[in-house]
Amino acid sequence: MNPSAAVIFCLILLGLSGTQGIPLARTVRCNCIHIDDGPVRMRAIGKLEIIPASLSCPRVEIIATMKKNDEQRCLNPESKTIKNLMKAFSQKRSKRAP
């Protein structure tokens, strides 16, 4: 093999190995694909999880797990109903804490 061809071949291999770990596009990964704006009864919620905005997902996510069937519903944090629900949930929680 020609020495200059071997050098070019090695440079190409080095260039390819350097680009292997670089992502082509940044993907946004949020937990909630569909956001529910419908009413939710506080008694029906078993667990309420608030996930703040981060680098992987630019929006705040509120995930409610229902008591009856463990169904998870993504709630709209901008909805007036959900804001009232969050306020009631935090008041209920603060009353329980000693």
From Swiss-Prot:
Q: PROSITE patterns from the entry?
A: SMALL_CYTOKINES_CXC
**Which cysteines are disulphide-bonded?**
30-57, 32-74
- Report where it is expressed, by tissue: Expressed in the spleen, thymus, lymph nodes and liver. Expressed in astrocytes, microglia, and neurons.
SUPFAM superfamilies, A to Z: Interleukin 8-like chemokines
What does its record list under induction? By interferon gamma.
Knockout phenotype, as recorded, reads: CXCL10-deficient mice possess a significantly reduced or delayed infiltration of NK and HSV-1-specific CD8+ T cells into herpes virus-infected tissue. In consequence, the antiviral response is delayed.
Single annotated GO MF? chemokine activity
Point out residues bearing the modification Citrulline: 26
Source superkingdom:
Eukaryota
Q: Which residues form the signal peptide?
A: 1-21
Task: Give the record's keywords alphabetically.
Answer: Chemotaxis, Citrullination, Cytokine, Disulfide bond, Inflammatory response, Secreted, Signal
Cellular component GO terms held in the UniProt record: external side of plasma membrane; extracellular space
What the protein does?
A: Pro-inflammatory cytokine that is involved in a wide variety of processes such as chemotaxis, differentiation, and activation of peripheral immune cells, regulation of cell growth, apoptosis and modulation of angiostatic effects. Plays thereby an important role during viral infections by stimulating the activation and migration of immune cells to the infected sites.
Protein family (similarity comment): Belongs to the intercrine alpha (chemokine CxC) family.
Q: What is this protein called?
A: C-X-C motif chemokine 10
What organism is the protein native to?
A: Mus musculus (Mouse)
